[in-house]
Amino acid sequence: MSAMSANDSARPQSSSEEVPLLEIRDLEVSFRSHSGLVPAVRGVSLTVYPGQTVAIVGESGSGKSTTAHAIINLLPGTGQVTGGRILFAGQDLAEAPERDFVALRGRKIGLVPQDPMSNLNPVWKVGFQIEEALEANGIAKGKAAKVRAAELLEEAGLADAESRLGQYPHEFSGGMRQRALIAIGLSARPQLLIADEPTSALDVTVQRQILDHLDGLTNELGTAVLLITHDLGLAAERAEHLIVMSKGRVVEAGPALEILQRPRHPYTRKLVAAAPSLASQRRSSALARADIREHALEVVGEAEQHGEIGVEFGKATDDVVVATGLTKVFKIRHGLRKSTDFTAVDDVSFAVRRGTTTAIVGESGSGKSTVAQMVLGLLAPTSGNVVFDGKDVATLDRRETLAFRRRVQPIFQNPYGTLDPMYSIFRTVEEPLRTHKVGSKAEREARVRDLLDKVALPASVMRRFPNELSGGQRQRVAIARALALQPEMVVCDEAVSALDVLVQDQILTLLNDLQAELGLTYLFITHDLAVVRQIADDVLVMSAGAIVEKATTDEVFNSPREEYTRKLLDAIPGGSIRLGA
């Protein structure tokens, strides 16, 4: 079914709103390469009515953003519309000259792009950038533009808007930058707003605030929204109609709830199954996790019987890591002589059971990543200690530190940033083996092949470089490297937050499988409670540097004690939509 037919069937035929605001018919978009035109969007049709929110959902490379950018003639590189029609308020934009788009962009069609740091000029004050948009669209200039810019920032939910006008983008948090882009996107009161992954890089609580505010503004102004996202749960919660895209084509379209509860296409079913925001509700997620924990503990038990655990530090304990009274205070300098103390972590205590996963959950700035760095021995605590297998990490000598590095390995958020772009995949995975003088050259190569096989990558990727791999493949390489020295514990710091939901699901499944097979212990850092149900046994909820709740995963999801935990649960996109078991 095309998106157009799905939408039409759901609208009353006699309504005065029957005339669509945006109607795309059989859109074709291609990119020119050395070998000719490469199709990116194939025969896409969709309809958006005035005041309606329609979401296009799909993984990276599905063509969803390309479709959106074709509407306003902002296709990157060699992209061009090669067929079909884009009717906006009766005008065919597929045939329109550039001068028509200059008049349309901002005034009639607004855009909120994905990455606010890349889309705000770092050398211009935020106020100037909003004023520039107002002037370009003929709304206001001079003092009037400044007054209006402050009103728009306030409207977008920023407190003390007038003083914010004089700040630069780097002085804003991610959520504040996104609000500034919303202010720019809605500054000319457009009829249609294209929101391209507007919250994918933000914490779930900030995401909810931003989307709630966007909903409120667009409802008040009567603006139609075309929402681009990879998260089916978020799309179903925010949009009336969904369009599911895969490989440049629309594979399913229709009313949001209907698609979510009764998906027909195999790809849509895969998206519904993969989205952590939806899987977090399912009892099956908890049952699968219990099974993995049981397998991992069996492996740990066998290793203990054979004396393979705790060799370097002495006898193994049930708790592989015990943190007591962890506190970290940073000095914030003001000029040459003045400084103030900032407490990032405040008296945090917890234990991680061997063969299990403990998740630390909290918003940005809660202190969770600082705790992870102290557990890894990368940051010295101001007070308190981290004990690994009965030994204080801060007191390790050089030999013990090397042993600790082998036994505890990290996986970080951005796989591209943590892989050397000049190293081949083979050299990347082999490096820890070479550094720790493990095996001969031939043995190391065999080990790399085995590691790549464990993370479901073909041996052929060994000679490739990070820029030749997708985000999910790069994260698999990072996992292979972390496992090279056969660690007992892996610290995953936002290891899936930068990935599409399908790739997220694949990586979470891989981490679970590896834990069951190797008896690994995980400390999993995340801002998103949705992924916790699939990966964790115990949960620590952090806020403002302190632990506000400690419980098992089931207790957190079924009977949270703290208001802050309930707030995080409520912020899970699509969490209110019932899917059954």
Model-predicted segments: where are they?
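ABC transporter nucleotide-binding domains
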Residues: 1-281, 293-581
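Post-kinase regulatory C-tail/linker adjacent to protein kinase catalytic domains
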Residues: 287-293
